């Protein structure tokens, strides 16, 4: 029994209703069974975050795949969750405390963590609720959090097993210190940005008074921690100085001149200062030469007690003062303006300070090797394939991973220290006393683990590991990971090596990479530019289906996507087009019960639309299997808008309105095509398709569990497609000719179709009704004819078309209108010629502007030619 649709589509009302229905009926939930599994783990968004366009794209793509596989009969689990986001979340709560005039230290660790958990409870559900408005068909009953009990147990277990294997160690090392976030961050959390700076040339006096050694540096404030000057062993200029001492300016400490191949002879003077405590390369040089490590900056990037009289100065103030003092001493040779790469914290954009500190590290080489092998042997595949090379290059050059963070919010490192004997005690349980000396004076490491450490375990920790649960056995390895190209190193690579280490299998078989969502000008969306678009607002104004469809049709794997409001409006127009066509179909299906399609009763249009439906089923299925989601969506858009709505629905009207026989057959075909098309479109636009599908005769409780459409052999009909294509070409050309001279749509007249081809003649005569209905013209088919006077001429599909104008338009008025158009065009040609002949314009205007104006001029000349031809033809007739 069909039920008609309201005249206007209201997305908000429809979306709320159906999401509630799906969730309450448990359609998203699944348990292991005998079916083939399909599993996706959601990249966990920050628990305190808000839905942004990147999330909207990422989760739309995952939802399309989940809904598609569910309809194909797979046991489909899309596992959702959120990330505790150490630095970001702690910063949010500290910001709140600052408003109250407090710091985290005022509260103490325990009370501060209570505040963070309270913040998480207040704001943690915001993003998951926003994902619901997008239509995400996740199994919310299985929602996880990286700090929940199960994930915390997994994190502790992984840390301790790696520690026991010797793959986690603690050592002094140069790390990336963020003075604003007050923590170490890993190499890949550092953004290297090109910045203007200066290269300072400084004279270091030789200890024997025989002269100077000139070094070049961009960071004179760190010279207070220099413990050597290095030159290349093959640099003839300095060979005799190797082994001698220079006096460190401002500190007056003798330091050696050493030879090391690390030095670039061509950079600066070929002599470089070595500061092992404040530069990663210098640190390595220092280890090779057993140099002391002098730290001169504290946690706030302020000069410390080793900086002498500069103690207490901010690093940039110290730089300024040191340069002034060097000038006064006559030791500053020169300053050179340069552009160089400067590391910034990816969270807060503060300039990173390389700094010596004791941290926890994961030894990466043994873990990277299996992850490299997995990509080389095809155990894991990247889509597009070009990202395999990017992934491998990073793993080939990987450094040990610094995993400790100087934060309170996160997974605390499961290691205790004995205050009496210094014993290091890794433990799964809380340590009360030292196993070595039995002292009860023990304390836990204050640091927490890098957020990405727990995220790296996501594909197996969320399925119950370290317990060997039914879910873990059934759903692991997961099927595909959908994620942005910006976190291949942060997350994808780490999940791969952790999965291989602890599960002995890759965590996912394929990685589908998408790009970033940029603004219309191709810029990253950011608060500072004020160019962000809020998906929640877009859903409120245009509906979730329109946003989803716009995002996916503008997307190709691995490439960035530009957000255009015009395309969003286009997606909404598409939803309205589908709604209106469906409303028409439903109005004509009242009291209809499907009986099945009888081939012998089908018209050419029926046979054509069913054959085209078959092709669309095959193409959409193939595109989805290849992760070409944008191509699949475009295929559906063109079929629904152009072929179904604009052609087939229009061609059924004479039959439905009783002007021709075959109304029942038209209803059967309309029903079959609309229902199947809705099922194909459902993964992309879940809400509107459910709303319409539920009003059609159907089996089952929801479209999301309807079987995925399959092509039918009896729908195949290449001949019908070929014939219909010819008929459509002829109709389009007649329409074009009528539009050229502004024939009113209601004005009907004769059109002469000239062809000697018997098959074409039969096709045109049998479908004269279609030409009359869609081209508002009465066709007369003849084998040959001279060009009639006062007729427009066209050619389509091997048919010559004559459109006599005499009875269609007022020839005098049309000539007058065309002359006015010609006058405007001539004025534009004159204006553009003057502009393009102006030397001032050509000299000042950008090349693309000049080219655009030239293109306009060419187009106007073409228009002038067409108008003159039409005026000539009308003048001849008059």
Curated annotation (Swiss-Prot):
For this protein, the Enzyme Commission number is 6.1.1.9
**What catalytic reaction does the record list?**
tRNA(Val) + L-valine + ATP = L-valyl-tRNA(Val) + AMP + diphosphate
SUPFAM superfamilies per UniProt:
Anticodon-binding domain of a subclass of class I aminoacyl-tRNA synthetases, Nucleotidylyl transferase, tRNA-binding arm, ValRS/IleRS/LeuRS editing domain
Pfam families named in the record: Anticodon_1, tRNA-synt_1, Val_tRNA-synt_C
Instruction: Identify which top EC class this enzyme belongs to.
Output: ligase
Q: Motif 'KMSKS' region located where?
A: 524-528
Highest rank taxon of the organism: Bacteria
- The listed location of motif 'HIGH' region is 45-55
Q: Which residues form a coiled coil?
A: 804-871
Name the residues that bind ATP.
Answer: 527
Q: Keyword Transmembrane, does the record have it?
A: no
Where does it reside?
A: Cytoplasm
MF GO annotations: aminoacyl-tRNA deacylase activity; ATP binding; valine-tRNA ligase activity
Q: Which CDD domains match?
A: Anticodon_Ia_Val, ValRS_core
Task: Name one cellular component (GO) term.
Answer: cytosol
Ordered alphabetically, the record's keywords are: Aminoacyl-tRNA synthetase, ATP-binding, Coiled coil, Cytoplasm, Ligase, Nucleotide-binding, Protein biosynthesis
Single biological process term from Gene Ontology: valyl-tRNA aminoacylation
Q: Which PROSITE patterns match?
A: AA_TRNA_LIGASE_I (PS00178)
Query: How does it associate, per the subunit comment?
Result: Monomer.
The record's function comment reads: Catalyzes the attachment of valine to tRNA(Val). As ValRS can inadvertently accommodate and process structurally similar amino acids such as threonine, to avoid such errors, it has a 'posttransfer' editing activity that hydrolyzes mischarged Thr-tRNA(Val) in a tRNA-dependent manner.
Entry remark concerning the domains of this protein: ValRS has two distinct active sites: one for aminoacylation and one for editing. The misactivated threonine is translocated from the active site to the editing site.
Family classification: Belongs to the class-I aminoacyl-tRNA synthetase family. ValS type 1 subfamily.
Q: What is this protein called?
A: Valine--tRNA ligase
Gene name, per UniProt, is valS
């Amino acid at each position: 029994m069909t039920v008609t649709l309201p005249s206007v589509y209201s997305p908000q009302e429809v979306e709320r209703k159906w999401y509630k229905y799906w969730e309450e009926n448990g359609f998203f939930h699944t348990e292991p069974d005998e079916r083939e599994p399909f599993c996706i783990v959601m990249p966990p968004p920050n628990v305190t975050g808000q839905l942004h366009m990147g999330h909207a794209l990422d989760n739309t793509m995952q939802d399309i795949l989940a809904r598609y596989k569910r309809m194909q009969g797979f046991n489909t689990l899309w596992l959702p969750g959120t990330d505790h986001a150490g630095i970001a979340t702690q910063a949010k709560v500290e910001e709140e405390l600052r408003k109250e005039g407090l710091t985290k230290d005022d509260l103490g660790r325990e009370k501060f963590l209570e505040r963070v958990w309270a913040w998480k409870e207040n704001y943690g559900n915001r993003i998951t609720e926003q994902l619901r408005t997008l239509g995400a068909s996740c199994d919310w009953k299985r929602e996880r959090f990286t700090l929940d009990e199960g994930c915390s147990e997994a994190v502790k277990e992984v840390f301790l097993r790696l520690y026991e294997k010797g793959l986690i160690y603690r050592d002094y090392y140069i790390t990336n210190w963020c003075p604003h976030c007050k923590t170490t961050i890993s190499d890949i959390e550092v953004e290297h940005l090109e910045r203007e700076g200066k290269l300072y040339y400084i004279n270091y006096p030789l200890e024997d008074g025989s002269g100077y050694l000139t070094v070049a540096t961009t960071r004179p404030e760190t010279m207070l921690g220099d413990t050597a000057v290095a030159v290349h062993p093959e640099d003839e200029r300095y060979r005799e100085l190797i082994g001698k001492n220079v006096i460190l300016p401002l500190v007056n400490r003798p330091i050696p001149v050493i030879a090391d191949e690390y030095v670039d002879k061509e950079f600066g003077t070929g002599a470089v200062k070595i500061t092992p405590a404040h530069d990663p390369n210098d640190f390595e040089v220092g280890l090779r030469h057993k140099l002391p490590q002098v730290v001169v900056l504290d946690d706030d990037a302020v000069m410390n007690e080793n900086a002498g009289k500069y103690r207490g100065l901010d690093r940039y103030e110290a730089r300024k003062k040191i340069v002034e003092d060097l000038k006064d001493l006559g030791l500053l040779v020169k300053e050179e303006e340069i552009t160089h790469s400067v590391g910034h914290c990816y969270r807060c954009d503060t300039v990173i300070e390389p700094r010596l500190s004791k941290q926890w590290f994961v030894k990466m080489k043994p873990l990277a090797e299996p992850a490299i092998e997995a990509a080389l042997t095809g155990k894991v595949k990247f889509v597009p394939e070009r990202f395999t090379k990017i992934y491998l290059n990073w793993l080939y050059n990987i450094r040990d991973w610094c995993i400790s963070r100087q934060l309170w919010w996160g997974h605390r490192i499961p290691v205790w220290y004995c205050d009496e004997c210094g014993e290091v005690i890794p433990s799964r349980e809380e340590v009360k006393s030292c196993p070595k000396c039995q002292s009860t004076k023990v304390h836990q490491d204050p640091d927490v683990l890098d957020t990405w450490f727990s995220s790296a375990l996501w594909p197996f920790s969320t399925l119950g590991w370290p317990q060997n649960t039914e879910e873990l056995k059934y759903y692991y390895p997961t099927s595909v990971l959908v994620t942005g190209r910006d976190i291949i190193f942060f997350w994808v690579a780490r999940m791969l090596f952790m999965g291989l280490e602890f599960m002995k299998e890759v965590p996912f078989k394929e990685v589908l990479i998408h790009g970033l969502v940029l603004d219309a000008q191709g810029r990253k969306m950011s608060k500072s530019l004020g160019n962000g678009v809020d998906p929640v607002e877009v859903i409120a104004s245009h509906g979730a289906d329109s946003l989803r469809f716009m995002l996916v049709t503008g997307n190709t794997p691995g490439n960035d996507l530009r957000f255009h409001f015009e395309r969003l409006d286009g997606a909404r127009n598409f939803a309205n087009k589908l709604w209106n066509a469906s409303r028409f179909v439903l109005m004509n299906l009242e009291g209809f019960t499907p009986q099945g399609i009888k081939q012998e009763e089908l018209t050419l249009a029926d046979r054509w639309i069913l054959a085209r439906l078959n092709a669309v089923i095959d193409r959409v299925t193939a595109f989805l299997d290849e992760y070409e989601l944008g191509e699949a969506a475009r295929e559906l858009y063109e079929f629904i808008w152009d072929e179904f709505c604009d052609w087939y629905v229009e061609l059924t009207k004479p039959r439905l309105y009783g002007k021709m026989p075959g109304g029942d057959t038209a209803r059967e075909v309309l029903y079959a095509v609309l229902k199947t098309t809705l099922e194909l479109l459902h993964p992309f636009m879940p809400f509107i398709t459910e709303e319409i599908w539920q009003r059609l005769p159907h089996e089952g409780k929801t479209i999301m569990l309807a079987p995925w459409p399959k092509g039918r052999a009896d729908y195949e009909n290449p001949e019908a497609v070929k014939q219909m294509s010819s008929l459509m070409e002829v109709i389009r050309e007649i329409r074009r000719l009528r539009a050229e001279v502004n024939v009113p749509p209601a004005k009907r007249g004769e059109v002469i179709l000239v062809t000697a081809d018997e098959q074409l003649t039969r096709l045109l005569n049998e479908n004269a009704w279609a030409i009359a209905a869609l081209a508002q013209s009465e066709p007369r088919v003849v084998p040959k004819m001279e060009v009639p006077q006062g007729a427009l001429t066209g050619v389509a599909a091997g048919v010559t078309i004559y459109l006599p104008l005499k009875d269609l338009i007022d020839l005098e008025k049309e000539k007058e209108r065309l002359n006015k158009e010609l006058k405007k065009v001539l004025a534009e040609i004159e204006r553009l010629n003057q502009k393009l002949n102006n030397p001032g314009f050509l000299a000042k205007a950008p090349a693309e502007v000049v080219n655009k104006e030239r293109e306009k001029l060419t187009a106007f000349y073409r228009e002038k030619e067409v108008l003159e031809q039409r005026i000539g033809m009308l003048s001849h007739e008059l």
